[in-house]
Structures are given as C-alpha cells and as structure tokens.
UniProtKB/Swiss-Prot annotation:
Single GO term (MF): DNA binding
Domain Tyr recombinase, residue spans: 106-289
Keyword Cytoplasm among record annotations: yes
GO biological process: cell division; chromosome segregation; DNA transposition
HAMAP family, alphabetized: Recomb_XerC_XerD (MF_01808), Recomb_XerD (MF_01807)
Any one annotated GO CC term: cytoplasm
Taxonomy, superkingdom: Bacteria
Active site (UniProt): R146, K170, H241, R244, H267, Y276
UniProt protein name: Tyrosine recombinase XerD
Length: 295
C-alpha cells in the first residue's frame, strides 16, 4: 500500500498540478486510511472491501471527525482507488458503493464595506513594508484571489496597461482577473519604487517580497492580515479567505452576474459561488429584522 500511495501522490502532483498544501491533506488522509487497514491486518489493496471502508469511517467518526472531514476523506480515498484501478495496481474499486455524507456548509464570515476600508487603511504607507502590505490587501480585495495564489504572482503576470492580472489557481488553472484603478496605482508605485528596495541583491520574479528580498510565505501574509485587523478594531473572526469572501459577497450584493463572479474566483462548480448569494440573503434578512417596523 505504501508504494501505491506514493505513486498516487506523485501522480496528483505532476498530472493535476495540485498545491503542496492540498497534497499534504491527501497524504494525511491516506496515512490515516493505511494505519487503520494495518490495524485490521489488511495487507493488500485487493483485500479492501466496502465493509472495511465503512468500518474505517466509523472509527474516524467515533474519534471526532466531522461530516465535512469525512466527506473530504471519502473523496481522497475514492480518487486513490480509482487511480489504483486505472493503473492496474488493483483489480477493483471498493469505494463504488460508498456514499458521501451530507453536511451543512457554513456561511463564510464577511466584512462590511466600512470594515474592509478600515483594514485597507491600516498599514503605514511611510514604511516600505507598510506600502507593500497595503498593496497586497488592495489586490486581495480587488480580485478575490486566494492568499496561496497571491504568493505565486510574478511580475510578468501583472499587466497594468491593460488592467488585469493572471492568477494560477487550483490544479494550476490560469484565469484572468480585471484590476480597478485604485489597485493599479498601488501596484505601479510598489513595482517601480517599493519592490526594488525590498529586492536588494536577490534575483527573483516573484511580485511580493519580504524585507530580505525573498518571496513572502502564506503564513507571513496571514499574520499581516490578522495584525492589521486588530489595529482596525475588527472583532470578527478572520481567516485567510475573509477578503475573498467579502469580494464575492460585495459584488453580488451590487448586482454582479453570478457566472462572472464564478470566473473571477476560479470556481469550477457554480454551486460553490452560489454560497455567497446565501450570505447576501442573510445580510438582507438581518437588515430587514433591524429596520422594518413590523419585523
């Protein structure tokens, strides 16, 4: 099993172009799966059947796994067994009759427009790292891109004359996202004036750099967002995706086309984008309850 798992992980990295974070999640799920099978003395992939998978799911559930975690786990092992069958490592796929549990998708936390503006205005523009941070925050809110996508952007991906940025999303899929005048101005100053000061003697095409001239990490950007949110007196629970959620919700609240928002976010399934319409409706209900005299 260990060999097949490693071959599968190589496959999803090379053929599907998944990020290291996604591959890490797949690896953790498959390690749990393999550990359980070893405890059950199942030593060969063809000895796995529907009953052993259901026992594994029961074991994970009893140890606190949520319906969402189980759904992801099933998706991982289903993909793994399909690969094993296709590549002739196995004679059958035991996941065929396994159902994915349904779970309530949590509505994402969204910042109000005034909260976004407060967050954007927090970095100190007199400092080079402050100007860089303001530019990153502006770009995240202007495009709805993921933090993991932001750190991959290179200079040639940004076209300030035409007003767009190339974003490489999940599976290395490329999409073009338009840029507004405000973020274009910040990017122009950052690229021409701020980035050369950060670059120093380093040679890299990565757009956003730390104070040592190296590409910024996901963790560093997340830390920056949290610190600025505290300074802006934002009490909501933030995640690295909060500005992405806010971007989508604010567009839809102002009448943007759902499919256009789907395209900008890079969602392969429109049902994922539709989640933001529910956020908008919940905001409408909240306003109705607060302001209507007969609510």
């Amino acid at each position: 099993m260990d060999t097949i798992i490693e071959e599968y992980l190589k496959f999803i990295q090379l053929e599907k172009g998944l990020s290291s974070n996604t591959i890490g999640a797949y690896r953790r799920d498959l390690k749990k799966y393999n550990t359980f099978l070893e405890l059950q003395k199942i030593s060969h992939i063809d000895f796995i059947d529907r009953a052993s998978i259901q026992q594994c799911l029961g074991y994970l559930h009893d140890n606190g796994a949520s319906a969402k975690s189980l759904a992801r786990f099933i998706s991982t092992i289903r993909s793994f067994h399909q690969f094993a069958l296709r590549e002739k490592y196995a004679a059958k796929d035991p996941t065929v009759l396994i159902e994915t549990p349904k779970y309530d998708r949590k509505l994402p936390d969204v910042l109000e427009i005034n909260e976004v503006l407060a967050l954007l205005e927090t970095p100190n523009l007199a400092k080079i790292n402050g100007y860089r941070d303001r530019t990153m925050l502006e770009l995240l809110y202007a495009t709805g891109m993921r933090v993991s996508e932001l750190i991959q952007i290179e200079l040639e991906d940004v076209n300030l004359i035409m007003g767009f940025v190339k974003v490489f999303g999940k599976g290395n899929k490329e999409r073009i996202v338009p840029l507004g005048d405000t973020v274009i101005e910040y990017l122009k100053t950052y690229i021409e004036t701020i980035r050369p000061q950060l670059l120093k003697k380093t040679v890299t095409n990565t757009l956003f750099l730390n104070m040592h001239g190296k590409p910024l990490s996901r963790q560093a950007i997340w830390k920056m967002i949290k610190q600025n949110a505290i300074k802006a007196n934002i009490t909501k629970s933030l995640t690295p995706h909060t500005l992405r959620h806010s971007f989508a919700t604010h567009l839809l609240e102002n009448g943007a086309d759902l499919r256009a928002v789907q395209e900008m976010l890079g969602h392969s399934d429109i049902s994922t984008t539709q989640l933001y319409t529910h956020v908008s409706k919940s905001q409408i209900r909240k306003m109705y309850n607060e302001f209507h005299p007969r609510a």
